[in-house]
From Swiss-Prot:
Stretches with biased composition (Polar residues): 236-258
BP term (GO), one: odontogenesis
Name recorded for this polypeptide: Odontogenic ameloblast-associated protein
Location in or out of the cell: Secreted; Cytoplasm; Nucleus
Post-translational note: O-glycosylated.
Keyword Disulfide bond among record annotations: no
Amino acid sequence: MKIIILLGLIGATSSAPLITQRLLSASNSHELLLNLNNGQLLPLQFQSAFNSWIPPFPGLLQQQQQQAQVSGHPQFPLSTLESFAGLFPNQIPFSRQVGFAQGGQAGQPDFSQQQTPSQTQQASPMSYVVPVKVPQDQTQMFQYYPVYMLLPWEQPQQTVTSSPQQTGQQLYEEQIPFYNQFGFVPQQAEPGVPGGQQHLVLDSFVGTAPETPGMPAVEGPLYPQKEPIGFKQDNVGVSTPSTSPKPDTGNFFTSEINPTIAPLLPEQKVNADSLREP
């Protein structure tokens, strides 16, 4: 119905007698209005290739004006009109209607006029292909889906980066106290020995160096040694509470230079090596 209404509006606008010369149109209403004064009905002519949808060519208009002024009945050869009709593939179904319309005579204009609108209605949906853009839009939409499907790839990175952080923190807790106090990393206690890690934590508070770091925990003193050694030389005159059962605070109030540090450090190394050989 919309197509029929549009065709009616276009035919009404194009049939207005604004120009005195005869012009080709998609319907026969324009020619009928121009020839009402003469009282004659002309046979249908080739009017499909040059309708209101297609802009007219300037060269054809000049030829049409000359022929209209000379004879009043313009006639185009079929060969030239078919060549021009081939340039417009959307108007091919209209060119087939012309062969039937040319068979009409001057005495039968109403019969041909009733058939041409029905044929134009059947051919109009064939000439215009509207749903061509639908598959293109669907293909474009499918191209965007992989972008959103790749979003969860951030999760495996979090699991990968979190695993070395745990190992780094464990190594940091085990090795840092020995770097600050002794300046070197001694061999740590085996993980299977019970109480080995507890001795390492207590040494950081007391400040004493054990002779055998792999010794298991027994009742009594934790590390039987001759003399405790204090390594905190910077904090002179400051006493800190210790967690050992028998605290010894004799070496905390010493002078800035402790002469017992230098000779005792190599002795600890010799005693540790002699105990590990057998």
